């Protein structure tokens, strides 16, 4: 009887552990693909300005606007190039052109202009956050995309404290 009870406890414990691993997709049930269904990897084929890029999606060009940041204008019609706009654009070109990036979408995937909205990851680094940290973008969020708001705002505060680029005055 004692042997059966011990065996039953071991089986129940194993079922619980495997169930938890299955629900969290860890252990032997971990997905081989992307870590999140809201993420995809693309090659950056062109940089429009500091916060807008074009990626190759299955042979088609896709215009992408980075969520949570707003860099000074450089290409907006009827708008002069704003201070640090060229620096932000050059920074993005230097880091992202011809690079494979991982895109992470939030709740709304397109803006009113039809651009894809995403967080851009270069390796393990979120590029949107990097722009704010370098003082080359202001944190700017629109409903309903707030996933990394606190993180990007913290990066901006750090740049402000250090008086980097757009915060230098």
From Swiss-Prot:
Keywords noted in UniProt: Calcium, Endonuclease, Hydrolase, Nuclease, Secreted, Signal
SUPFAM superfamilies: Staphylococcal nuclease (SSF50199)
Top-level taxon of origin: Bacteria
GO molecular function, one term: endonuclease activity, active with either ribo- or deoxyribonucleic acids and producing 3'-phosphomonoesters
Cofactors that this protein relies on: Ca(2+)
Region forming the signal peptide: 1-26
Catalytic machinery residues: 65, 73, 115
InterPro entries the record matches: SNase_OB-fold_sf, Staphylococal_nuclease_OB-fold, Thermonucl_AS
A single cellular component GO annotation: extracellular region
Primary location group: secreted
Enzyme class, broadest EC rank: hydrolase
Catalysis performed (reactions): Endonucleolytic cleavage to nucleoside 3'-phosphates and 3'-phosphooligonucleotide end-products
Known EC number: 3.1.31.1
Record's cofactor remark: Binds 1 Ca(2+) ion per subunit.
Subcellular location: Secreted
Family membership: Belongs to the thermonuclease family.
UniProt-listed PANTHER family: EBNA2 BINDING PROTEIN P100, SERINE_THREONINE-PROTEIN KINASE 31
Protein name from the UniProt record: Thermonuclease
UniProt source species: Staphylococcus hyicus
GN (gene name): nucH
């Amino acid at each position: 009887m004692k042997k059966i009870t011990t065996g039953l406890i071991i089986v129940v414990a194993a079922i619980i552990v495997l169930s938890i691993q299955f629900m969290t997709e860890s252990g032997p049930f971990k997905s081989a693909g992307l870590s999140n269904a809201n993420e995809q990897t693309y090659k950056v084929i062109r940089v429009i300005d500091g916060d807008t890029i074009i990626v190759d999606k299955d042979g088609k060009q896709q215009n992408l606007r980075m969520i949570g940041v707003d860099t000074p204008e450089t290409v907006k019609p009827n708008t002069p190039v704003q201070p640090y706009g060229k620096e932000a654009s050059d920074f993005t070109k230097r880091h992202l052109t011809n690079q494979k990036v991982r895109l992470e979408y939030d709740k709304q995937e397109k803006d009113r202009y039809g651009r894809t909205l995403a967080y851009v990851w270069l390796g393990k680094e979120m590029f949107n956050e990097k722009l704010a940290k370098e003082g080359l973008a202001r944190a700017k969020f629109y409903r309903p995309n707030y996933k990394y708001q606190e993180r990007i705002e913290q990066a901006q505060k750090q740049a402000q404290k250090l008086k980097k680029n757009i915060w230098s005055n």
